[in-house]
Amino acid sequence: VISVILPEEDMPFLPDGTPVDIILNPIGVSSRMNLGQILETHLGLAAGTLGIQAKAPVFSGHNIIAIEDMLARIWIINQANKNFGPLSIDLETHTYIEENSVKDWLNSKNQDYDKVFGANYPGEAREACLRIWLKDDQGIDTADLSIDEIENQVFLLNQQQNIAAPTLGKSVLYDGKTGEQFDQPISVGYIYMMKLSHLVEDKVHARSTGPYSLITQQPLGGK
C-alpha cells in the first residue's frame, strides 16, 4: 500500500544530497518474514558501488563477515574519494581504474590494501574499516584493542548514542522538508521493486440492499 507520493525534493536525502526513491515500513519486513529484502538491500549497495555481481544461493550465499567486508570496502572507497577525487570502475573487468588512490589512503592509515581488498582475507576489510572509523570519526584509539573489543565499542555506540558503524549498512538521513537529521540511522541500499496491479478502484464496491448471512448478518461475497 502506497501511503504518500512526494516530490523528489521532499524525500529524505543522504549526506551527499542524494534523495532516496522509496521508503519501506520496517514493520512490513518482519511481519512478512521477508529478511531477503535486507540481504538484497546490502548486496545491492555493494554491487552498485563495487561493480560486482552479488549472487546469493539459498544455502551457499554470502555470510555475515563477507557482507560486512563489502560494506567496509564501500566506506573505504568513499573516504578515499573525499581525499583523492572521484574513483571510476571498469565495468568489464570490475576493477578500480584509480586504485592507487585507495592504496595511498589505506597506506596513510597503516592498512594493507592487498589484505583489505583481497578475497583470501575474510574479515580484514571489516576490521580495518572499524579501526579507522573509530579513530578518525569517534576519537577512540584502537591500536591496543582486539577485534572483540572493537566490536564491543561499535555495539555501545549503536545502543547508547544511535551511531551506526559503516559495516551495519545504515546511513544518516535528513528530512527533505525541514533539513533536520532523523534520530536513527536508516538502512539504505539498492533493491528491485515490482509494482503489482492491485488497485483500490478495481476492488471497491458498495450496495444499499442485498443478500446477507443469517449468522453474521454480513453481506455475502461478490459485487
Each language-model region and where it sits:
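Long insertion/accessory domains within large nucleic-acid-processing enzymes
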Residues: 1-223
